[in-house]
């Protein structure tokens, strides 16, 4: 199961882990299928750490799940922030997942069991390189020039009716 994020700087193909994180993947894939993420900017970009998106308001404070409320974390001892390109839900503490997610630029073991890992980049690491190079506001880590998710291709959706 995979999706491709088509961004202003290139494509990123992500494998999603539906068996280990079914609720998170159901939410993510439904948001992808409904074009929820289309036009979202990468609003937080910290070199060597991660890049974050998934907030339609572009502020880093917005975004909802498909259920209209925050939902619980899905941790697995098998899913770690152990390589470049891990995809996780962003949150504001335990069980506060909505629509925002981030992609790591490297190993981030301090995030394990605090953020739900639900995917990994399987193609497009060069696009991740381009994102990491973007100049940012040094206080807010927001890229100086907006980079958007233009649209998303779903390659196979096990939750589709």
Curated annotation (Swiss-Prot):
Function description: PPIases accelerate the folding of proteins. It catalyzes the cis-trans isomerization of proline imidic peptide bonds in oligopeptides. May be involved in pre-mRNA splicing.
Gene Ontology terms, MF aspect: peptidyl-prolyl cis-trans isomerase activity
The catalysed reaction is:
[protein]-peptidylproline (omega=180) = [protein]-peptidylproline (omega=0)
Q: PANTHER family annotated for this entry?
A: PEPTIDYL-PROLYL CIS-TRANS ISOMERASE-LIKE 3, PEPTIDYL-PROLYL CIS-TRANS ISOMERASE-RELATED
Query: What does the tissue specificity note say?
Result: Ubiquitous. Detected at low levels.
Give the CDD domains listed for this entry. Answer: Cyclophilin_PPIL3_like (cd01928)
Could you give the subunit structure recorded for this chain?
Identified in the spliceosome C complex.
UniProtKB keywords? Acetylation, Isomerase, Methylation, mRNA processing, mRNA splicing, Rotamase, Spliceosome
Omega-N-methylarginine sites (modified residues): 61
GO-annotated biological processes: mRNA splicing, via spliceosome; protein folding
Q: Name one GO cellular component term.
A: catalytic step 2 spliceosome
UniProt protein name: Peptidyl-prolyl cis-trans isomerase-like 3
- Family named by the database record: Belongs to the cyclophilin-type PPIase family. PPIL3 subfamily.
Please tell me the species this chain comes from. Answer: Homo sapiens
PPIase cyclophilin-type domain ranges (all copies): 2-154
Task: Write down the EC number.
Answer: 5.2.1.8
InterPro entries the UniProt entry points to: Cyclophilin-like_dom_sf, Cyclophilin-type_PPIase, Cyclophilin-type_PPIase_CS, Cyclophilin-type_PPIase_dom, Cyclophilin_A-like
